[in-house]
Amino acid sequence: MELNGPPVSQLPQTATSTASLPVTVAGTLLRGPQLLLRAAEKYPRTPKCARCRNHGVVSALKGHKRYCRWKDCMCAKCTLIAERQRVMAAQVALRRQQAQEENEARELQLLYGTAEGLALAAANGIIPPRPAYEVFGSVCTEGGTDSKIQKFDLFPKSLIPRSVTPQLSSGGKPVSPDSESVSGSAPGASSPEARPGSGSENGDGESLLSSPISKALKEGEESPSSISPLGSESGSDAEKDEQDPSSSSSARQRTPIDILTRVFPAQKRSVLELVLQGCGGDVVQAIEQILNNRGQDKSEETWSRDGALPSIQPSVSSTHRPLIAGALTPAIGTLGSRSAFSPLQPNGAHFGTEANAYQLGGHLGLNPLRLAYSAHSRGLAFMAPYSTAGFMPTLGFRPPMDYAFSDLMRDRANVHKDQVYTNGLYGPVVNNNAEKQ
């Protein structure tokens, strides 16, 4: 009987194995969520709460920060964790800001180009300005006169003839040697407010780049001794005041003989040294002597032609100048013909735009400043702006041909009034004013 049936001990084992199978399946189905499991079992890379870990508890970080039981703990470990979190948050914020600025700069580069986009981004404060783009702000940060000098350094000097190049002032208009002599004799005579009519003296340095080209090329055909129009000669007193602060840096580095050679490039250096030595090193007086002596090189025909002035109605080509004393007097507002408040004057052609029209120094034998500031001209200046061209035809100055070079250093202010005003027009009025003073 033992050989026919299986052993009795094997029957309950199979029954127990079949009965335990559904129990294990039900156990796997009844487990909780996997986020609540310990880190040792599964998903060890899940973020955990650091404060709970300091106190021996492992908690998943998702949705746990508000409900953490140690969120207000002030122990040493929790304080260190809070400091680390603050540093990490600052680093993340900085990286986000840098990434945003780079994106905005990249968008500006796509819209405006590389250089303009970076310059625009630096101007808007998106990115800090770099040294490569400091050129855009160098002109604006300097003063007004320095900016004018810098703009004219960029001007191509090769377009200007050699005789006109040293006569360019920092104000942007060519100045003749005669106007420099007038301005040099009395540098502090008048204020810059006496020139309201001109364009470049009002401070608009942007209009300076176009004006010197036409003016310089227009006067380039004349000799270095050519005379500028009435505006640059009569207004040179105020021009000197404007030139002094702007050209002070360059004038400090030049010697007097260098200034003379720059003003008179056609003269020999030895002659200029002799004149400067005779004037005691005074550059202004040396320039005045050279300009006064230059007119005596002319022939007798030139003197007779310049002396025969029409007395009724001057033409365009005449060298007739009736209002020289009134125009040179700064007490009535220098640039009388350009002022908006002065009476109407004849046109610019009447005042002799051609060369040798206003050369007072040579053939008139009078220093323009002494004529302007003398007692006679002060009396004449109050009537000269209100007189027409035909009403006061000419000032009969006697051309002294017999004066030597050394005699020009004399003071012509003591010349008798009958010798200066030979025509007798306005003689009593002028003489009375002279006697009162």
From Swiss-Prot:
GO terms for molecular function: metal ion binding; sequence-specific DNA binding. Residues 254-289 form the DMA domain. It comes from the Eukaryota. Residues 179-201, 223-235 have a biased composition (Low complexity). Pfam families: DM, DMA, DMRT5_DMB. Keywords: DNA-binding, Metal-binding, Nucleus, Zinc. Residues 163-254, 297-317 are annotated as: Disordered. GO terms for cellular component: nucleus. It is found in: Nucleus. Residues 49-96 bind DNA. The keyword Zinc applies. InterPro entries: DM_DNA-bd (IPR001275), DM_DNA-bd_sf (IPR036407), DMA (IPR005173), DMRT (IPR026607), DMRT5_1_DMB_dom (IPR046472), UBA-like_sf (IPR009060). Belongs to the DMRT family. May be involved in sexual development. PANTHER family: DOUBLESEX AND MAB-3 RELATED TRANSCRIPTION FACTOR DMRT, DOUBLESEX- AND MAB-3-RELATED TRANSCRIPTION FACTOR A2. This is Doublesex- and mab-3-related transcription factor A2. It comes from Xenopus tropicalis (Western clawed frog). The gene is dmrta2.
